[in-house]
Amino acid sequence: MISSFHRPTVARVNLQAIKENVASVQKHIPLGVKTYAVVKADAYGHGAVQVSKALLPQVDGYCVSNLDEALQLRQAGIDKEILILGVLLPNELELAVANAITVTIASLDWIALARLEKKECQGLKVHVKVDSGMGRIGLRSSKEVNLLIDSLKELGADVEGIFTHFATADEADDTKFNQQLQFFKKLIAGLEDKPRLVHASNSATSIWHSDTIFNAVRLGIVSYGLNPSGSDLSLPFPLQEALSLESSLVHVKMISAGDTVGYGATYTAKKSEYVGTVPIGYADGWTRNMQGFSVLVDGQFCEIIGRVSMDQLTIRLPKAYPLGTKVTLIGSNQQKNISTTDIANYRNTINYEVLCLLSDRIPRIY
């Protein structure tokens, strides 16, 4: 999907806010802890290359989801460590080694496949993934991890790190969190040759469980100024939301009582009213279920009426505004504000998803 530069819909990304958010977390965690910036999924929709370059002086490395995301950063000139958090199969090893990309290995089956395909790991840097209770990928015992580490070393790999991921670090009830933490600590204690880096702290753990940090953290959603819990838990320090989303009115008209708006004729005017059309729709990640939500025009909340279309939505206006009038979908407009979390709450989802769904069709302005 190409970026649509010839329409007024844009996402503005404040790189300085991202830098300050990361600095706030770094002040909050113990000294000497390494910081990895999580820039997977195009830095949660903010632009992986631009964010990575902005954070280059502040962080020790980056985390991405897959090899393609890692290669994008390398090709952009990012020379610090890049860790792929997902599983990379052995047939892609040569490309990872050639580009000095660190991979995650999460099972003994991976070793069996590498041997079957006669893959050597000379020059490969590895972090071992432990499943402490998330239930996705990872090993479950010290015995398995010891065997994996020995096998990787036989194949020539440098086992630099070991890590896990907490399922409930952003919840008030820390029962599951503590179970996972103790599981991971016990597993680490049973290792014959512990890797140099041990990390379990995502954004939520770094904020609310900073006393449990090992020697590295992975900062994702908090870097972009959002509360990992949505609004369930209070933040110990302020954050600046880094992305705003805006467009403009491209059509304004008056409709009469009884007129309908949008697909399915789901909205019927009860009286004469002004309606404005905004060029953003579900193809941009502004989903169909946003009917009834309000955006900002001239410092006033204006309700989305009718179904959101693929490319456009319609809003009820308090008066006739000129074409080109600014419409704020995320961010501030004359002292009033719409946050990504507000949108997530309306959709009954999480703020992460709202950002990640914003498509490439929306240009990012820095």
Curated annotation (Swiss-Prot):
Keyword field: Isomerase, Pyridoxal phosphate
Cofactor(s) recorded in Swiss-Prot or TrEMBL: pyridoxal 5'-phosphate
Entry keyword annotation includes Phosphoprotein: no
Enzyme class: isomerase
A Gene Ontology term for the protein's cellular component: cytosol
Gene3D superfamilies: Alanine racemase, Lyase, Ornithine Decarboxylase, Chain A, domain 1
PROSITE patterns noted in UniProt: ALANINE_RACEMASE
Catalytic activity: L-alanine = D-alanine
Chain coiled-coil ranges: none
UniProt-annotated catalytic positions: 40 (proton acceptor), 263 (proton acceptor)
Pathway membership: Amino-acid biosynthesis; D-alanine biosynthesis; D-alanine from L-alanine: step 1/1
Modified residues (N6-(pyridoxal phosphate)lysine): 40
Ligand binding (substrate): 136, 310
GO biological process: D-alanine biosynthetic process; peptidoglycan biosynthetic process
Record GO terms (molecular function): alanine racemase activity; pyridoxal phosphate binding
Record-listed E.C. numbers: 5.1.1.1
This protein's record includes keyword Isomerase: yes
SUPFAM superfamilies given in the database record: Alanine racemase C-terminal domain-like (SSF50621), PLP-binding barrel (SSF51419)
Job description of the protein: Catalyzes the interconversion of L-alanine and D-alanine. May also act on other amino acids.
Family from the record: Belongs to the alanine racemase family.
Protein name, UniProt field: Alanine racemase
Organism: Streptococcus pyogenes serotype M1
